Amino acid sequence: MRNKDNQHSRLYYIILTIVIIAICVVVVILFNTLKTNRSHSTDRYADFTELKKDTIKNKDWRIKTKHRKNKDILVTAIHGGGIEPGTTEIARRISNVGKYNFYTFEGLRKSNNDQLHVTSTHFNEPILDKLLKNTKETLSIHGFSGDDPIVYIGGKDKKMSHSIAKELRKKDFTVKESPNRIDAKSSDNIANKNESNSGVQLELTTALRKQFFKHYKLDRHTRSAVSYTHLRAHE
C-alpha cells in the first residue's frame, strides 16, 4: 500500500513539474511577443493612413524630399522634426555629403510630436513607398533614448552594416548591435523595402544627437538654426 502511495506521490510531482515548465514556456513566449509589439502598440496611429485622416499636413507635419544624382541610395528620417529631434538634420547632412536621395517626415507641433510616431513596419506613406521601389540601398536614421553617446546599428544588409560600423568606429563613435526590439530585421521595416529587400537602420541615442548641435540642445530653435559647420566637425 505504501509503495502505491509513493508511486502516486512521485507521479503527482512529475505531472506538477511538467505543468510548471509548460506555464514557464508560455509566459516566455507571451513576454517575447509583447516585447516585439510594444513599440507599435504604444503608437497613437496604427499606420500613416490613419495618421493622415486625423491630422493636418503642413500644420502637424510635413514631408521633405531631395532627389540626387546617386539615386541608388536613399537616406530617411521618418521620425524627424520634433518626433525624434535631430534625426532630420543628421539624415539631411548625410544626404548632402554623399549626394544621396533624401526623405524626411517631420513633426511640426510645439508639443506632443510623439503622437505622430508611426513605427517603421507600418509607415505606409505613398511618397516614401515610391522612392523605395526605385532604391537599391536605404539608410534609415532614428533617435533612441540614452545618456551615453551610442549608435545602435541594425537592418538586413549585413555587408553595409559592417562597412558603416567600421567607418564610424574609425571616427571614435561607439557602435553596438541593435537590441531585438529595434533591430530592423523585419521585411516590413522601411529600411528593407527597397529593390534589394535589405537596408541599414541607425538608432542614435539622445546623448549622441545632442553632440551634433550647438550647446548640446535639441530644441526647435537650435535645430532650425543648425550650423553645418558644427555637424561637419563630427564627420
Please state what every model-predicted region is.
Residues Q115-E137, G143-Y228:
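Catalytic cores of processing enzymes, dominated by hydrolases/peptidases
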Residues T17-I29:
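Hydrophobic membrane-insertion alpha-helices, especially the h-region
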Residues I90-H122:
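A glycine-rich, hydrophobic loop/mini-helix early in the fold
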Residues T229-H234:
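Conserved small/polar residues in nucleotide/adenosyl-binding loops
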Residues T76-R93, V97-G98:
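N-terminal carbohydrate-binding/catalytic regions of secreted carbohydrate-active enzymes
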